[in-house]
């Protein structure tokens, strides 16, 4: 409601709105009907690999001691996943309500909307819950959905980064991206124009860099906190 009020008050004026929703996040809880929308007994649990942890980097072993997924019962884990799905559906409905508000105000064809998340969740994968310093796909592969004037509806497979968001916004505002910014504007690729392929992207969590190689089949990350740099596989 406050986001729509903000837009309504600035009708006819350029505006920038950062609409932040804290969910899905711990504690895993939401309201009805979302809390019972996904029956826990219908949900599959991620596979558990016996003795998986002993070959992982030291940083991941430390995180596991704090956020142990294997210490959570299957029933509890299903409850967590059920609520996580419910929270995401709640967000989906709220974002839909906001987009409908833009349409009512006549702004849907003149507004750039960017939907993004900062990280994913383990939800039991790799015997972990919540998040950690490891660069697994379930944590770093986040949604980046953009609706913009003249954008071509498509699914983009090329490697992009959250640092591309700011240059993209500047491009649509008709502003130059500072030379010190590493990100690239996604405006060309949204218009189905040429976009140079990336060889790499940077990522960091809690001050711990993770070199990450991804050939689209076997992502491998290495932790600088591991004495033997043991690889962590997807």
Task: Describe each PLM feature range.
Residues 1, 6-13, 18-159, 172-175, ...:
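Active-site-proximal cap/lid insertion segments
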Residues 43-45, 50, 160, 201-207, ...:
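Generic preference for hydrophobic/aromatic residues in regular secondary structure cores
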Residues 119-125, 166, 171-234:
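C-terminal cap/loop subdomain of S1 sulfatases and analogous C-terminal strand-loop tails that border
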């Amino acid at each position: 409601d406050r986001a729509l009020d903000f837009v309504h008050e600035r009708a006819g004026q350029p505006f920038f709105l950062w609409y932040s929703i804290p969910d899905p996040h711990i504690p895993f809880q939401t309201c009805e009907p979302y809390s019972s929308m996904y029956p826990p007994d219908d949900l599959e649990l991620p596979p558990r690999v016996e003795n998986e942890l002993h070959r992982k980097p030291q940083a991941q072993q430390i995180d596991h001691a704090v956020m142990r997924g294997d210490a959570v019962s299957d029933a509890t884990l299903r409850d967590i996943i059920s609520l996580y799905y419910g929270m995401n559906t709640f967000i989906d409905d709220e974002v839909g309500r906001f987009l409908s508000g833009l349409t009512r105000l006549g702004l849907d064809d003149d507004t750039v909307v960017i939907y993004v998340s900062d990280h994913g969740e383990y939800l039991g994968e790799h015997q972990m819950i919540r998040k950690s310093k490891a660069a697994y796909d379930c944590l770093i592969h986040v949604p980046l959905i953009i609706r913009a004037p003249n954008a071509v509806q498509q699914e983009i497979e090329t490697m992009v980064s959250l640092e591309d968001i700011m240059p993209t916004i500047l491009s649509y505002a008709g502003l130059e991206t500072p030379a010190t910014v590493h990100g690239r504007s996604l405006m060309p690729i949204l218009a189905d124009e040429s976009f140079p392929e990336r060889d790499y992207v940077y990522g960091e969590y809690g001050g711990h860099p993770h070199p990450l190689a991804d050939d689209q089949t076997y992502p491998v990350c290495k932790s600088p906190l591991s004495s033997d740099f043991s690889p962590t596989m997807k």
